[in-house]
Amino acid sequence: MNPSPPSAAATPSSARAPSRFSQFYALTKPRVVQLIVFCALIGMVLAVPGVPTWLDVRLALIACAGIWLVAGAAAAFNCLVEQQIDAKMRRTAWRPTARGQLSNPLTLAFSAGLCALGSWVLYVWVNPLTMWLTFATFVGYAVVYTVILKPLTPQNIVIGGASGAMPPVLGWAAMTGSVGPEALILFLIIFLWTPPHFWALALYRVEDYRKAGLPMLPVTHGNEFTRLQVFLYTLVLFPACLMPFIFKMSGWLYLVAAVLLSIGFSGHAWCLWRNYSDALARKTFRFSLIHLSALFAALLLDHYLI
């Protein structure tokens, strides 16, 4: 499908503003950013013992807003850099930048504006450490991963996953002004979760990545090798998911959830390795989302109920 010509985007003035808003909103990758903010919120909650005060709640809400703004800025910058790649892939061809609906200067200004506003919010209303860690995460994702690693190496997800694993650290820093070992455990869980999550997606989208010229693992090393890596990573992830219980960050409720979810993820990966199908790869990818969301939700419930 050819990108829509500029004239096709013209609408009556009454409809122009909502359409433009939806385009900018799409640039922020809302679903991804929602998961980022959720993981940051878990770090915030675990950093505060007992029932939070109103001041704690206020600080957490402000921190979530600042992190959302900077995460949205990173997503928009990613769309700007990868617009030609996105246009070649079915999964991303709908993005406004890929369709030529937003100019490069406008997209760059939008990304810079969100980043500046979010950084200001975090620096002034939260603390400088959180601002600098969040800005470093922006650079890690938008520049190191998107510009350098992704088009260069099949290990892009492994190395670049460090920026994606930062949200709980940001949340912890927001509430305490420091980075505790508990935050690093949450970082480790997301860091190890990221490769099998993305490689499951890459397995059934391999032709998209091949057409776009991206050296994702299934493109460079083949289907079978990637399936094995997905399975092995879920095995390494399993004990990491038990660490919050081992180090007394959580109780039995989280332990039960972590064991069941980890068995489920490893089970999906085992089936994927032994008997591949696109449908099973898609199912594994979707379960990985359930795994992380439910795991952190269990941490949240355990913190208040046990």
Swiss-Prot record:
For this protein, the Enzyme Commission number is 2.5.1.141
Q: Where does it live in the cell?
A: Cell inner membrane
Enzymatic class: transferase
- A GO CC term? plasma membrane
Q: Could you tell me which InterPro entries the record lists for this protein?
A: Protohaem_IX_farnesylTrfase, UbiA_prenyltransferase, UbiA_prenylTrfase_CS, UbiA_sf
Instruction: Quote any Pfam family the record assigns.
Output: UbiA
- Give any single GO term for biological process: heme O biosynthetic process
**Which additional comment does the entry carry?**
Carbon 2 of the heme B porphyrin ring is defined according to the Fischer nomenclature.
Record family assignment:
Belongs to the UbiA prenyltransferase family. Protoheme IX farnesyltransferase subfamily.
Name under which the protein is recorded: Protoheme IX farnesyltransferase
